[in-house]
């Protein structure tokens, strides 16, 4: 009986700590992104991950090739990397280049030349959170942490002490420079994804994989 009375406040207290610790930062209209002035609040089902977006009607079938600019790391005053080391930012940028190249290549022919029927895609990393070492993994085995992660998984939310990545995407018609699509997003693994909890950047990398797949899915 005493153990049950003690366990309830402990679980409740842990959940309160999780709610406070995992609120995280949300992407904003970054001042140094070219398409920022055209972004509008997203009221769609994906608004929690994509709070701001812009788009015009596009017949994506008209485009058969794509130019992917080198993924850049955003250095504006409103960047959201916290105390992440520059080496880790560079690692994520390289991984993003690989993830978006691989996924765009499944839908389009990759090219370095602009022209009719060619898209130009710009991806700019604007923020990231590393997984809290030991704690992030422990939450998958802790009663309160597992409960929290289970709820977050259903809601499509971020796991306890899990990492994430934020970035801006701009898609242009390379021939005339028209902005076709743009958005800022925060991506992270499913809250119950245990493998993504191991390694400080694993969750952010998983987020980039998911984000690259999501972009291509919107171009069909």
Question: Which residues make up each language-model segment?
Answer:
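Solvent-exposed loop/turn segments at secondary-structure junctions
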Residues: 73-75, 127-131, 187-190
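Surface-exposed short loop/turn segments
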Residues: 102, 106-175
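A solvent-exposed, charged loop/short amphipathic helix patch at secondary-structure junctions
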Residues: 79-92, 143-151, 193-196
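C-terminal/domain-edge helix-coil "capping" segments
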Residues: 23-55, 157-166, 170-220
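N-terminal segment of the mature soluble domain
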Residues: 59-122
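C-terminal motif of bacterial Sec signal peptides marking the signal peptidase cleavage site
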Residues: 18-21
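N-terminal post-signal-peptidase region of extra-cytosolic proteins
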Residues: 45-56, 85-86, 101-109, 151-155, ...
């Amino acid at each position: 009986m005493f153990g049950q009375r003690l366990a309830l406040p402990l679980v409740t207290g842990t959940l309160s700590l999780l709610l406070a610790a995992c609120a995280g930062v949300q992407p904003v209209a970054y001042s140094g992104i070219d398409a920022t002035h055209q972004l509008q609040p997203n009221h769609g089902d994906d608004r929690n991950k994509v709070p701001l977006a812009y788009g015009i009607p596009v017949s994506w079938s008209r485009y058969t090739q794509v130019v992917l600019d080198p993924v850049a790391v955003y250095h504006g005053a409103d960047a959201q990397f916290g105390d992440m080391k520059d080496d880790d930012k560079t690692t994520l940028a390289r991984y993003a280049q690989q993830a978006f190249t691989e996924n765009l290549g499944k839908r389009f022919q990759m090219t370095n030349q602009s022209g009719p029927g060619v898209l130009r895609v710009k991806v700019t990393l604007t923020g990231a959170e590393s997984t809290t070492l030991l704690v992030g993994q422990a939450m998958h085995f802790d009663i309160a942490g597992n409960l929290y992660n289970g709820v977050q998984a259903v809601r499509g939310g971020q796991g306890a002490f899990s990492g994430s990545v934020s970035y801006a995407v701009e898609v242009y018609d390379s021939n005339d420079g028209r902005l076709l699509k743009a958005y800022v997003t925060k991506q992270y693994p499913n809250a119950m994804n245990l493998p993504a909890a191991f390694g400080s950047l694993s969750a952010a990398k998983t987020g980039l994989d998911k984000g690259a797949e999501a972009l291509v899915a919107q171009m069909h």
